[in-house]
């Protein structure tokens, strides 16, 4: 590695620290959040791990002294809602934390890695807040935070090509299908994001009029009528990148309806988390995750997520990227 390449990597590392520190400061202030510590692993039988699309298997290990099988978290969606209850948060107060996960079955490409790092967050809300207007108000706060950090990073490192609009554009998954009926869901996201630069697609989970789903969602935490994805257009890669997924959490009625629809009723009696929902023991919350490496990749105008995070990649893959001038950490 030559000196120029080393200097470039060192500058990137410093910029990553700037982005993370700045984002956390503004994020906590704008959403009234307190930072908390979070688990790296949970008991496999607790029901607290996120099973994502129920096809990706969590990485697990046997803890000899505990005589238990533990699972590396795939996200903290369920744990956070329980934490708000246990930690005694008040209405409209929330938490955020660093979530580090291993998703062994994930794809590997310029925006996907088997290592996932994100800010997981959750806020205590009222039942009356379970509506699209409230969801959009939270999205606007998160987007304004991203934009503040973008402007700060532009002044420090001048990536130039990153341009975010003053406001984010909202569209439902059905409206998006109506707009581009002959395109795949991912292609619709790309076309709309390329035009508007920053978008939020809401109401993801149920089939659209075509019979297809925008993208598969677990039925256990988000209300599929009150959730969505925050997506930006990354000009360097000519690509739509999801920076955040979030939603108002399920009530008992939402949970029953969605698990019945997804045919995932078989383990409810033995699942601690499911039982808490069914017995109305969990507070009403809104929450989500914001990809740390993806945000850094986007704001620093990088071609590959491996330029801003350390993971494991196939040797041939790394060699091919190196030929293109892309050095993975």
From Swiss-Prot:
The keyword Lipid biosynthesis does not apply. GO terms for cellular component: cytosol. Pathway: Amino-acid biosynthesis; L-asparagine biosynthesis; L-asparagine from L-aspartate (ammonia route): step 1/1. It catalyses: L-aspartate + NH4(+) + ATP = L-asparagine + AMP + diphosphate + H(+). Keywords: Amino-acid biosynthesis, Asparagine biosynthesis, ATP-binding, Cytoplasm, Ligase, Nucleotide-binding. GO terms for molecular function: aspartate-ammonia ligase activity; ATP binding. Its EC number is 6.3.1.1. It is found in: Cytoplasm. GO terms for biological process: L-asparagine biosynthetic process. PROSITE patterns: AA_TRNA_LIGASE_II (PS50862). HAMAP family: AsnA. Belongs to the class-II aminoacyl-tRNA synthetase family. AsnA subfamily. This is Aspartate--ammonia ligase.
